[in-house]
Amino acid sequence: MREIVHLQAGQCGNQIGAKFWEVISDEHGIDPTGTYHGDSDLQLERINVYYNEATGGKYVPRAVLVDLEPGTMDSVRSGPFGQIFRPDNFVFGQSGAGNNWAKGHYTEGAELVDSVLDVVRKEAESCDCLQGFQLTHSLGGGTGSGMGTLLISKIREEYPDRIMNTFSVVPSPKVSDTVVEPYNATLSVHQLVENTDETYCIDNEALYDICFRTLKLTTPTYGDLNHLVSATMSGVTACLRFPGQLNADLRKLAVNMVPFPRLHFFMPGFAPLTSRGSQQYRALTVPELTQQMFDAKNMMAACDPRHGRYLTVAAVFRGRMSMKEVDEQMLNVQNKNSSYFVEWIPNNVKTAVCDIPPRGLKMSATFIGNSTAIQELFKRISEQFTAMFRRKAFLHWYTGEGMDEMEFTEAESNMNDLVSEYQQYQDATAEEEGEFEEEAEEEVA
């Protein structure tokens, strides 16, 4: 079996990670003690991707939980599925990172990272054929962003040919915890561009808007935001966890989704959007699901896909439905909106169908888009970064941990390069492509 080792780092990473395990354990018929009570062979067919089978037929998540302070992990341990995790896989410090990327990446986090890697190694060794790693973390804090990216680069060193996939929560001024979020996020993106194969950008601003506008929640809590995140994570991993043909492992997904190595930041979406209480009241049709799934209001990243073009798209439909209808609807969307898909990648929309719907829904659709509009998100962070960095505000917290201003400047320019790369491919047309080649050849000559 092709196994995935899951890591969760920092407060946010552990909270959405714990929620992810609750949701997928439920989908696979596994109770909080790790015992299987399911009703379908499909639930067990690829259970080994995320779970180890321990003695006595118990299923244990292949998960490593990391934090620089014990608080969040205590609440995971005392939460509904806290007892399902392997006790040795909780690795935590006592000092905390104080929302400081440098502490997570260079000082406090660097002291803890070896003990985390020991646990990761142990998990990787119990795998039959490891396909890769997935990390849940946020980019705004200290541990998830600083130590999370440190873990990624260390794992990359040790397992260079394995896929590295992250679910990264991007900070937003609307749901802000700390004033230095733009610094932490920019330093993290600098790392993610180089060291991950696939990054799902989950954006607090978009989650907030969905709760507020679509779900009509006047005061959304983190619980409500995390409900959306876990629905999305369950959807994008459905292909990996249940038998199917398309994008059935992380590498195949990357091959379909990433046309240029640096442009691997995906915009996830989900349909139907329901609040935590009200799932079961109406069944959607395939056309409605498709319509909703491509709607800007359903995107989990606060970017408007109409401001850019899709390089590639993967869609996962879940539930019992007609494949023919799904294919027709997906073609329909592409034909009607052809200007929003780059014409120099033919067949750039792939669709998978998985028979088992998420709990409480007859059918659902998850959307993964590699759109040039994601540059809006990086621009937003970059502007906030520049505003503070110009005045060197709060910089002493970072230089005090041994960082150099140079690293900030590099991170800033790497992020701006990323934005212009997205812009370049947004403007490119099939005809021009040849001209680029010729110009390049002339320069060489």
Swiss-Prot record:
Provide the binding site for Mg(2+). Answer: 69
Positions carrying Phosphoserine:
172
Q: Which InterPro entries match?
A: Beta-tubulin_BS, Beta_tubulin, Tub_FtsZ_C, Tubulin, Tubulin/FtsZ-like_C, Tubulin/FtsZ_2-layer-sand-dom, Tubulin/FtsZ_GTPase_sf, Tubulin_C
Q: Which GO terms describe its biological process?
A: flagellated sperm motility; microtubule cytoskeleton organization; mitotic cell cycle
Its main subcellular localisation, reduced to a broad class, is cytoplasm
**What residue spans carry the Acidic residues bias annotation?**
429-445
Where is motif MREI motif found?
1-4
Which residues get modified to N6-acetyllysine?
58
Record remark on domains: The highly acidic C-terminal region may bind cations such as calcium. The MREI motif is common among all beta-tubulin isoforms and may be critical for tubulin autoregulation.
Protein name (record): Tubulin beta-4B chain
Per the UniProt entry, what species is this protein from, by scientific name? Rattus norvegicus
Name of encoding gene = Tubb4b
